[in-house]
Amino acid sequence: MKRSIFAPNLIKNAHFYKIEMKKVVYFLLALVVVGLGACDNGPKFKVQGEVTGAADKMLYFEASGLEGIVVLDSVELGSDGCFGFVGARPESPDFYRLRLDGKVVNFSVDSTETVTLKAEADKFDTDYVIEGSASNQKIKELVLLHGELQKKVDKLSQNRGIPAGIAQQTLSNLINEYKNKVRKEYIFSAPNTTYAYFALFQTLNGYMIFDPMANKDDIKCFAAVATSLNNTYPHADR
């Protein structure tokens, strides 16, 4: 069989093609690396701090989005309990949280601030110190107020000696007392803040405390916050 006069050229062209393809691949990889570097150089916020008594435990950094909780990063804490996370600056104020052994600390971020948290592992979600934003101190106050309400409701439900009618009235009084305080001190006083928004969506045993579908006064709370935040952040998703 005669050897084709085109064979050497085909082999030569194939070799040339492989070389060129390698160049293209390297070029594309370089573009990806540069692109990732460019994304990584965008505005950031930091979350850092220390959790004592939490050696070898996992600490999770999560986003509290409209579609649910998303884990952004995690770290296994060392003996010193120090940690640090970095996140891309949100386009508008958004909510995040740190989770340790099922205990959660909620906080908000609206710029490139540094949020610093110090806590003990066994009191992670109740006795923590958070710095870097006045809103986050208010969110902590709301969490503690809610915790006190939950304790009172739990105690009431465990008292089997109270007639059902009295128990129901007592429950309503507890909830209304809580709502009046939050409405006055956290919602209407500063409706354009993240903590006012946070207050609206707290729940009690699975039910919304402020329920715009069942209470006309609650509608006013939602309207005040929605109007204020929309004026301040017209392009926000929330």
Locate predicted features:
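A non-transmembrane, solvent-exposed segment enriched in polar/low-complexity residues
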Residues: C39-E185
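N-proximal helix/coil linker or "cap" segments that precede and/or mark the start of modular domains
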Residues: I219-R238
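Amphipathic alpha-helical repeat scaffolds of TPR domains
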Residues: N192-Y207
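Inter-repeat boundary and helix-capping residues of tandem alpha-helical solenoids
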Residues: N176, F188-S189, T193, D218
